[in-house]
């Protein structure tokens, strides 16, 4: 590896407990590149599927990792076992509602109906 730095072994834990990896990465790999790796290997059978890297958040040791940071900058060495696998959690950002559908909902007439039943 460049600069004699050891590769970092990482696995990605998805929201349902399944994993992608582990795989080894150069410490100079950016978080954005890791997200591209995850996106390319996202399981097809998942109900929730990210469309872009911006739909993904990576969390390591309780911190949300920034896209422009490298893996070396994002590491939290406390509690890591030398030569062990680092588990990063992957969160999929919910899809943003379409602005046009929001306006339609806001402009639609509200129906006042009682949902109560008196027995």
UniProtKB/Swiss-Prot annotation:
Gene3D superfamilies, A to Z: Phosphatidylinositol 3-kinase Catalytic Subunit, Chain A, domain 1 (3.10.20.90)
Location in or out of the cell: Cell membrane
Keywords on record: Cell membrane, Lipoprotein, Membrane, Methylation, Prenylation
Modified residues (Cysteine methyl ester): 116
Residue stretches making up the Ubiquitin-like domain: 8-76
Entry annotated with the keyword Lipoprotein: yes
Descriptive protein name: Membrane-anchored ubiquitin-fold protein 3
Chief location: membrane
Gene: MUB3
Membrane topology label: Lipid-anchor
SUPFAM superfamilies found in the cross-reference section: Ubiquitin-like (SSF54236)
Functional summary from the UniProt entry: May serve as docking site to facilitate the association of other proteins to the plasma membrane.
Propeptide: 117-119
Secretion signal span: none
Lipidation (S-geranylgeranyl cysteine): 116
Gene Ontology CC terms, in alphabetical order: plasma membrane
């Amino acid at each position: 590896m460049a600069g004699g730095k050891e590769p970092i072994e990482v696995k990605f834990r998805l929201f349902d407990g399944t994993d992608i990896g582990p795989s080894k990465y150069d410490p100079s790999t950016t978080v954005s590149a890791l997200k591209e790796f995850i996106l390319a290997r996202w399981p097809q059978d998942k109900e929730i599927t990210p469309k872009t890297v911006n739909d993904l958040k990576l969390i390591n040791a309780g911190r949300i990792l920034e896209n422009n940071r490298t893996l070396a900058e994002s590491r939290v060495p406390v509690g890591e076992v030398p030569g062990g696998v680092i588990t990063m959690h992957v969160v999929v950002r919910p899809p943003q509602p379409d602005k046009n559908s929001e306006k339609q909902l806001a402009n639609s007439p509200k129906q006042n109906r009682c949902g109560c039943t008196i027995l």
